[in-house]
Amino acid sequence: MAQLKRILGIDPGSRKTGFGIIESGRFHPNYVSSGVIRVEKLTGAQRLKTIFESVCQIIDQYQPHVMAIEKVFVYKNPSSAIKLGQARGVILCAAAIKEIPIMEYTPTQIKSTIVGQGHATKDQVQFMVQNLLKLTESPQEDAADALAGALCHDRYLTLGIDPEKISKGTKF
């Protein structure tokens, strides 16, 4: 039997960051854990510090082999884009410090892989994540998005597609 690989999915946010952990390597992925890092009541640097420390703690607790994180897309509001970029930066820094490889996927890649269409709704993503992982209830939105990222990475691995090429934007 193939060795189990633990995948940490991250849905970055400046106020709420979703995380989800699955194990890959069997016939289908297995759910390990998920949740949301909430920092909306904090300000500026305290938000970033809390996100960083929380991601480090999650990595220490679950020992993932890889992180699958959603790529940033262009926002109409530059301030929101900067805040999201800062949150992503501390998340990527946590993974780098813990020596966890990072794979990046666009929201469209994740939705296409999990739901079958790149413009799927949050409800559709939650529904598919719940069914694919055989969960008794639907995960929170941000946690579902993070689990979807982990499932996307798992699917690419299962299909034998080199995740490095995916992260570099190679078209298939």
Curated annotation (Swiss-Prot):
It is found in: Cytoplasm. The keyword tRNA processing does not apply. Coiled coil: none annotated. It comes from the Bacteria. One of its GO terms (cellular component) is cytoplasm. The gene is ruvC. This is Crossover junction endodeoxyribonuclease RuvC. SUPFAM superfamilies: Ribonuclease H-like.
